[in-house]
Amino acid sequence: MLTLGLESSCDETSCALVENGKILANRIASQDIHAAYGGVIPELASRAHLQIFPKLLAAVAQDAEVSLEDVELISVANTPGLIGALSVGVNFAKGLASGLKKTLIGVNHVEAHLYAACLEEPSIRFPALGLAISGAHTSLFLMPNATTFLLIGKTRDDAIGETFDKVARFLGLPYPGGQKLEELAQDGDEEAYPFSRAKVSGNDFSFSGLKTAVLYALKGNNSSAKAPFPEVSETQKRNIAASFQKAAFMTIAQKLPDIVKAFSCESLIVGGGVANNRYFRRLLNQTCSLPTYFPSSQLCSDNAAMIAGLGERLFCNQTYVSKEVIPCARYQWESACLSH
């Protein structure tokens, strides 16, 4: 089955073609315009998606050397995300589906991030623990199989990617700051600042306290939002970045062993933009006793290959109930319960 995937949940526009689980073409266009504002401006993101989609669609068809007439299924990210951005993608997909007379399926963007690893490693054993880490999400899922996602835990405040961006801004790094903070931390002393990690009950996470601790480390007792940041040496910046990065990722890693045991998981799957962090990859490979799967770098970012792949799998497994595809900014997952 040849499947066209479309992704526009935030500030990346992407089109991809996947055939029977194999990626034929995958194009991603990032929107640099938001850097000047220090964050994503939803209206600008929507306009950019409108302009970019037609060009990307033509490009992936050329890359894969196929005609759009050959597409059998169109899969589009319709939740969760920025409502305007999602609407652009869904409406573009509906127009294509109507014009080409093809079947249309809506796919959950976060679930697709976890399915990305399955595209590259089809032999993952289930049940698996799925960890989605991005700018908007820090969530744990029980995955009885590759297409079922039951919520186990989530952040109670900031997502880890959002926290990275905020701390990067404290350190004077340009937006988006997550990768730049990782690079800064490489030459820092991760033991220089003993940032405490939030002890949240159950399987949830919290990062707001860690963010505040970094603010105090930089500003001292005068940590009000209006107070200017004092001059900090490059060595201090590197040490703060390294110490913060360790504390943030240990907040997650320290919880995983008990959760894995409680739900009898046989694998760990990690997805989302933050999954591309090399420090975190090494940390989990050192601390997790299970086979751990990360997508390749391109499939960590928002991309349409994961949307096409999950849509194709759902359709072929006949686990997708046909319904109108509607964009939705938020999504409420079913929770997993422990059986006693």
Swiss-Prot record:
- The UniProt record gives the binding positions of Fe cation as 109, 113, 302
Keywords of this protein's UniProt record, alphabetized?
A: Acyltransferase, Cytoplasm, Iron, Metal-binding, Transferase, tRNA processing
Q: List localization entries.
A: Cytoplasm
Q: Could you tell me what reaction this enzyme catalyses?
A: L-threonylcarbamoyladenylate + adenosine(37) in tRNA = N(6)-L-threonylcarbamoyladenosine(37) in tRNA + AMP + H(+)
Which of the seven top EC classes does this enzyme belong to?
transferase
Q: How is the cofactor bound?
A: Binds 1 Fe(2+) ion per subunit.
The record, for Pfam families, names: TsaD
Q: List the disulfide bonds.
A: none
Q: Name one GO biological process term.
A: tRNA threonylcarbamoyladenosine modification
An example of a GO molecular function for this protein is: N(6)-L-threonylcarbamoyladenine synthase activity
Q: What is its EC number?
A: 2.3.1.234
The superkingdom of the source organism is: Bacteria
Residue positions annotated to bind substrate are 132-136, 165, 178, 277
So which cofactors does this thing need? Fe(2+)
Q: Which InterPro entries match?
A: ATPase_NBD, Gcp-like_dom, KAE1/TsaD, TsaD
Q: Which GO terms describe its cellular component?
A: cytoplasm
Q: Tell me, in a sentence or two, what this protein's role is.
A: Required for the formation of a threonylcarbamoyl group on adenosine at position 37 (t(6)A37) in tRNAs that read codons beginning with adenine. Is involved in the transfer of the threonylcarbamoyl moiety of threonylcarbamoyl-AMP (TC-AMP) to the N6 group of A37, together with TsaE and TsaB. TsaD likely plays a direct catalytic role in this reaction.
NCBIfam families associated with the record: gcp_kae1, T6A_TsaD_YgjD
The UniProt entry's sequence similarity note says: Belongs to the KAE1 / TsaD family.
**Protein name per its UniProtKB record:** tRNA N6-adenosine threonylcarbamoyltransferase
Q: Which organism is it from?
A: Chlamydia muridarum (strain MoPn / Nigg)
